[in-house]
Amino acid sequence: MLADKLGVSFCETSDNGTGDEHVEVIHDWPSQHTKIGTKEKVPSEVTYQKQGLIWGSLIPPNVQRHMWTKLQLDPTQKGEMVKIVREVSTSSSQEPNKQPVEIIADFLAQVKAHLIKNLDQKFGKVLWRTLDITLVVTVPAVWTEVAKARTLEAVDKAGFNAPEFPQLKKIVMTTEPEAAAIYTIKSLRGMYDAYSWSYSRVVASNTPIQKHSYGLQDFLLHLQ
């Protein structure tokens, strides 16, 4: 299973190999100074220079860049995004014709290339391409349907698809709170009876919580 979390400021990627419970988070993101980073996250930033695209921690200080682009995927965030761009972003002269989906796809393409490099080193270039893969993409809990569709479009444009991952069986999108809950539940498998009791208590009421609980259960079935 591969998991990719594109945050507003940072991105992180992980895998859990052949389905064991150990989750391995990528730490060796390239960095401008050492070429190898030691952090779990990489800045969700890109810049388009004469020599080509530069991304993440490879971008030198004081260089104009696209940042916080993720928020532009959601049309309801438009007003907020204008304010953020004025106060924080220095990307006004960066590829003005580039749309947010294209910019994010360019960034994720670099993430994908680095992920494949790690998979090649860990499993070998041939072996991992024979393994069934589920790609999990997390999004904010308040993400609109339009924003979700644009996120998936960027993921596909970046190459997270069958041509690049021959055994890609499905792409699952879930919200960040649900992903955290799922991780906790899977970590507490030995307490299944307690979880079942809690679940039955939650779904007994006709509230939005009930709908989220069913969604969580459906997602767990996808992962089995």
Outline where the language-model segments fall.
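Phosphate/ATP-binding catalytic cores across multiple sugar-kinase/actin-like superfamilies
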Residues: D106-V126, A180-T207
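Extended hydrophobic secondary-structure segments that form protein cores and membrane-embedded regions
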Residues: R129-P140, K170-T175, H212-L216
